Amino acid sequence: MAAAGGAVLLLVLATATSVTGQHDYSDALHKSILFFEGQRSGRLPPDQRLRWRRDSALNDGATAGVDLTGGYYDAGDNVKFGFPMAFTATLMSWGLIDFGRSFGAHAAEAREAVRWATDYLMKATATPNTVYVQVGDAFRDHSCWERPEDMDTPRTVYKVDPSHPGSDVAAETAAALAAASIVFRDADPDYSNRLLDRAIQVFEFADKYRGPYSSSLHAAVCPCYCDYSGYKDELLWGAAWLHKASRRREYRDYIKRNEVVLGASEAINEFGWDNKHAGINVLISKEVLMGKDEYFQSFRVNADNFICTLLPGISNHPQIQYSPGGLLFKVGNSNMQHVTSLSFLLLAYSNYLSHANVRVPCGTSSASPVQLRRVAKRQVDYILGDNPLRMSYMVGYGSRYPLRIHHRGSSLPSVAAHPAQIGCKAGATYYASAAPNPNLLVGAVVGGPSNTSDAFPDARAVFQQSEPTTYINAPLLGLLAYFSAHPNLAQSDLLYD
């Protein structure tokens, strides 16, 4: 049984491409970080490297009497959605925490990418028992095609508070601040302490006033970032990061006390801005596998079960498909968000397993840490060009990549090239154009193939496949950092250590 499973896994790892040249993971890492500069909102710093971008949304928050300038636009639009932005910051931080040394010369710019998000999240949580969770009217914004520098749609401010709870977005924000506090512990101790103090306050608010923000703010946040999985996973996720950042026993006790109540054992192999179940189990399992806390053994069992569902030919209950070209595939929009987030968990867990010198039990078979790393690396290589179309899905990497991405700022002339305002409906001409985008959003990874055929239309209108998001790139940073430091996993290690 083990041999058969290994053979299928080897087939998936080797399938559908003869392009096996070494990728420049360090260059891809640099570009993936650079992408975040293209997503910046607010007043841009003098060292801004994507020069076609200019200042934007300088009055955000003014209608509510608060300063909400800064932060990131989530994707190809001009709305600031707090839920995916917080998740983006959490995942960038996790990559730096686990693979910080592998970032090498790119560590400082990666920290700056985190700080751009956390500076905003600190503003969004400056009022006690309140989290400002969105700036902009998604429906009005999505009816326009205009540069962020020009946008004239309403910058409506949305918040959660005791009367309108949002435990999901608040707990994710707490997780982001806590994770970032670890990132800045040595580089900027004062900032680190402020991040952790705020994370503690925000989590207390999230836990005390329970409820989904999708109920409190349904008309504003749905369907774009409705929390379909509920808020319980975010409460555990936030507690896990606070435990990791503070080492306070109260968070350890909170996790164990609420493990069943908040659904930690639910067999869900999802991980993304909405659903944190798999991430919770992998993150907490590190405590067990690193020999720090046997108290969390149940989370390791959950993590093992989750990991097995991702391994082709090994699981008796696979929940993941792979395309003929070897791409991990889950039904829904923007498949690359699943590819990068699940690959990150595979890589992180493989390192925890390696430290403990153990394998993942999968029924009558088992998987080695190297097998997990191989699956993760195969996904990264697919993104960078080892796929049936022989194209990179990262803009600016390789000789062939998406040219017509679904992104307002990239597809419209820059302010330097076209100083006059391009109004809401005037941008439609550029949206419908078959011409390549005039501004290169370097490092952007698009949604990619949307089914198991490995097809990609490179069409601006097909946003499910052509739109980049911050939460596609966020987990990719850690992956690229690791493989830039460890590019060669011997072919003999494909199946077993």
Swiss-Prot record:
What GO terms fall under cellular component here?
Answer: extracellular region
Keywords annotated in UniProt: Carbohydrate metabolism, Cell wall biogenesis/degradation, Cellulose degradation, Glycoprotein, Glycosidase, Hydrolase, Polysaccharide degradation, Secreted, Signal
Q: List the disulfide bonds.
A: none
Q: Name one GO biological process term.
A: cellulose catabolic process
- Show the GO MF annotations: cellulase activity
Leader sequence segment = 1-21
- Keyword Glycoprotein on entry: yes
Which Gene3D superfamilies has this protein been placed in? 1.50.10.10
Question: What are the EC numbers?
Answer: 3.2.1.4
Establish whether keyword Glycosyltransferase is in the entry. Answer: no
InterPro entries from the xrefs?
Answer: 6-hairpin_glycosidase_sf, 6hp_glycosidase-like_sf, Glyco_hydro_9, Glyco_hydro_9_Asp/Glu_AS, Glyco_hydro_9_His_AS
Q: Which organism is it from?
A: Oryza sativa subsp. japonica
Give the record's family classification. Belongs to the glycosyl hydrolase 9 (cellulase E) family.
Upper classification of the source organism reads: Eukaryota, Viridiplantae, Streptophyta, Embryophyta, Tracheophyta
Name the reaction it catalyses.
Endohydrolysis of (1->4)-beta-D-glucosidic linkages in cellulose, lichenin and cereal beta-D-glucans
Source gene?
Answer: GLU13
What compartments host this protein? Secreted
Which sites are catalytic?
Answer: 77 (nucleophile), 406, 458, 467
This one is known as Endoglucanase 17
Q: Which residues are glycosylated?
A: 451
